[in-house]
UniProtKB/Swiss-Prot annotation:
Pfam families: Ribosomal_S16 (PF00886). InterPro entries: Ribosomal_bS16, Ribosomal_bS16_CS, Ribosomal_bS16_dom_sf. It comes from the Bacteria. This is Small ribosomal subunit protein bS16. It comes from Borrelia hermsii (strain HS1 / DAH).
Length: 83
């Protein structure tokens, strides 16, 4: 079982927001998450990002791999994620 940290789409049509979640890599995008780590609101004036750093670091330590999109969003918001 390969675990990924990725985005889960929520919200209304044309007003999306995303939850940053830990999921099995074989799960569908909007499937059941193992744990929620934070959220990302791309529609807001200032792309709002909030993440629980302790949980994020814990999952990275357990071998979870962040998706490229999650890495880009977090690096853009001064939260350094190693490749």
């Amino acid at each position: 079982m390969s675990v990924r940290i990725r985005l889960k789409r929520m919200g209304a049509k044309k007003r999306p927001y995303y939850r940053i979640v830990v999921m099995d890599s074989a799960s569908p995008r909007d499937g059941r998450a193992i744990e929620e780590l934070g959220y990302y609101h791309p529609v807001e004036m200032q792309n709002q990002v909030k993440i629980n750093e302790d949980k994020f670091r814990d999952w990275i330590g357990k071998g979870a791999i962040p998706s490229d999109t999650v890495k880009r969003i977090l690096n853009k918001n001064n939260f350094k994620v190693e490749s």
